[in-house]
């Protein structure tokens, strides 16, 4: 760090070279004038240089929060460690931050201002949304401190406001998500077989027999299926926010536990082999051959089938069926969890199979199903004792 002094009219000014901006790579300088004597300017310059060499000097930038957020997003996106879908979430959350602070300078945002911001969010958004925005804000201000744009982090001592839950919200927490009973699942699959293209039968059978997410199913490739060892390797998910068939992306799973091997039975193996035979007969010279298991057939043949199309097809089939329970494809994941619980599989094993680290929905389904099983066991015991 270097500095010099020059005379400007009747007063003296010092200029300090602060090196290059870590984000823009441009040269940064700090100057201050109005000193009556050269000696006063030298003393002020010496104080700054001493702080700099001690590592305690920070030249707070005049940059606005909006300008810094733009730079932060560029840095955040360029690491190669963050998924596209996560970046989109961060962009959305920064928009909420900037709507509130508008053109405020980064250095002018205080802890009190940030706490007021959280109180404002608490009146507008659900708790999970508030927490997401807060996480993003903390990342932004932490990076600003790290890069010496500001001296302190205004989010550091903030307190997350809590809403008192309503009776309706407390009741909804206890609600069990919808799923098919065994008889309903069999009827649904039978209806699919009668009314839809054979590929859809294989799709819904795979979802119901593995509990995989619909994005995991759409990303599935034949190389992921080991027919010999009877298992499917799950390590990626389909991402297509624009729903443009040819502009899809395959992303790694969000969590470590989502990467897993799922055992499959002979029923599913037999159906997958039949599906592969049908697919091989359909392949044409225009086929987009990227080894996908479930693909478009007429338009864009070979491209992976989309979650939206599978959801639409399931809704159409349910309307034509006699099944009262209306589900989305994700409901087949809940169905799989409930059937495993009925079969006596332990909760942790179910969560491992579904790729969950911790999931209240799966736990609620498990407790609901096993509670009914315990009641049934007690009834059988009571009946036995009455017959003695």
Task: Provide a role label for each language-model segment.
Residues 229, 240-242, 247-259, 263-268, ...:
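C-terminal secondary-structure termini that scaffold catalytic or DNA-interacting sites
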């Amino acid at each position: 760090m270097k500095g010099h002094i020059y005379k400007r009219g009747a007063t003296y000014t010092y200029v300090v070279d602060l090196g290059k901006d870590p984000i823009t790579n441009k040269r940064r300088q700090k100057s201050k004038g109005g000193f009556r004597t050269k000696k006063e300017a030298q003393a002020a310059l010496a104080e700054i240089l001493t702080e700099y060499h001690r590592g305690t000097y920070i030249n707070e930038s005049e940059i606005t929060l909006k300008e810094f957020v733009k730079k932060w997003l560029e840095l955040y996106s360029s690491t190669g460690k963050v998924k596209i879908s996560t970046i989109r979430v961060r962009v959305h959350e920064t928009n909420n931050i900037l709507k509130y602070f508008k053109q405020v300078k980064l250095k002018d945002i205080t802890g009190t201002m940030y706490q007021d911001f959280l109180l404002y969010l608490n009146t507008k958004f659900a708790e999970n949304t508030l927490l997401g925005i807060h996480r993003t804000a903390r990342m932004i201000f932490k990076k600003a401190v790290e890069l010496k744009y500001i001296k302190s982090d205004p989010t550091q001592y903030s307190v997350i406001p809590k809403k008192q839950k309503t009776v309706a919200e407390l009741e909804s927490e206890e609600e069990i998500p919808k799923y098919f009973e065994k008889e309903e699942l069999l009827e649904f699959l039978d209806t699919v077989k009668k009314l839809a293209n054979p590929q859809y039968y294989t799709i819904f059978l795979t979802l119901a027999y593995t509990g995989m997410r619909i994005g995991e199913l759409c990303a599935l490739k034949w190389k992921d299926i080991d027919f010999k060892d009877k298992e499917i390797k799950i390590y990626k998910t389909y991402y297509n926010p624009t729903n443009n068939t040819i502009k899809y992306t395959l992303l790694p799973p969000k969590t470590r536990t989502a990467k897993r091997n799922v055992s499959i039975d002979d029923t599913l193996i037999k159906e997958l082999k039949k599906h592969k035979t049908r697919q091989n007969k359909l392949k044409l010279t225009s086929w987009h051959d990227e080894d996908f298991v479930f693909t478009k057939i007429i338009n864009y043949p070979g491209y992976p089938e989309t979650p939206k199309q599978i959801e639409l097809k399931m809704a159409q089939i349910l309307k034509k069926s006699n099944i009262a329970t209306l589900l989305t494809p994700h409901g087949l994941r809940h169905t799989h969890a409930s059937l495993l619980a009925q079969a006596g599989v332990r909760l942790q094993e179910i969560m491992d199979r579904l790729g969950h680290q911790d999931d209240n929905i799966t736990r609620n389904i498990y407790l609901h199903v096993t509670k009914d099983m315990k009641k049934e066991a007690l009834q059988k015991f009571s009946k036995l004792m009455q017959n003695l």
